[in-house]
Design a protein with these regions (language model features):
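Glycine-rich phosphate-binding loop
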Residues: 99, 103
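C-terminal "cap" of GNAT-fold acetyltransferases
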Residues: 8-10, 17, 122-168
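Acyl-donor-binding surface of acyltransferase catalytic domains
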Residues: 1-9, 81
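Acetyl-CoA-dependent GNAT
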Residues: 11, 15-98, 109-111, 115, ...
């Protein structure tokens, strides 16, 4: 007996809308506490990142993409200006558990890279954690290289932060 695989879940990417930043903060806090035991200081960091994005948003140089399927939030990512010249920073990649393995993360990262090139950036930098194995695989697949590691316990657990970079 053979079974046909169900068709892949379809999704679209869109730019952020009112209410998205609060939802991004909420989902990050819930998921990272559940999966990695991050404490409320992580939620505080995400709140600052999303608030800074809204306060300083430059549509010519920055974006936040939301992946969704029929209005259901599947994931998100941000690209923001870094302090370094001609460098963008990839922030807040997150894919809901139900959407993992469907290409959502790959599509979000590709959107960042494509936009960064169009905007004239020469590099994209990011900071991630060694425990985020799925995200790390996606970054490596997209051509990012790990350039530095730094142990920390900023969110109540021992972690290894990783700095990655992509030359465009």
């Amino acid at each position: 007996m053979t079974y046909d695989k169900p068709p892949p879940k379809q999704f679209t990417l869109r730019n952020h809308q009112p209410g998205d930043m609060g939802y991004i903060t909420h989902r990050h806090a819930i998921i990272y506490e559940k999966q990695y035991n991050f404490d409320s200081r992580f939620e505080s960091l995400i709140s600052r990142i999303t608030a800074d994005f809204l306060d300083n948003f430059n549509p010519d140089l920055e974006r936040c993409w939301i992946a969704e399927n029929n209005g259901e939030f599947l994931g998100c990512i941000m690209l923001v200006c870094d302090k370094k010249l001609k460098t963008a920073k990839l922030r807040l990649l997150m894919v809901e558990e139900s959407a993992r393995g469907l290409g959502v993360g790959t599509a979000l990262i590709k959107a960042c890279i494509d936009f960064a090139r169009e905007a004239g950036y020469e590099h994209i930098d990011l900071w991630t954690q060694s425990v985020l194995e799925g995200a790390r695989r996606l970054y490596a697949k997209a051509g990012f290289k790990m350039i530095e590691t730094q142990p920390h316990s900023d969110w109540g657990v021992d972690l290894v932060g990783e700095f990655w970079s992509l030359k465009l």
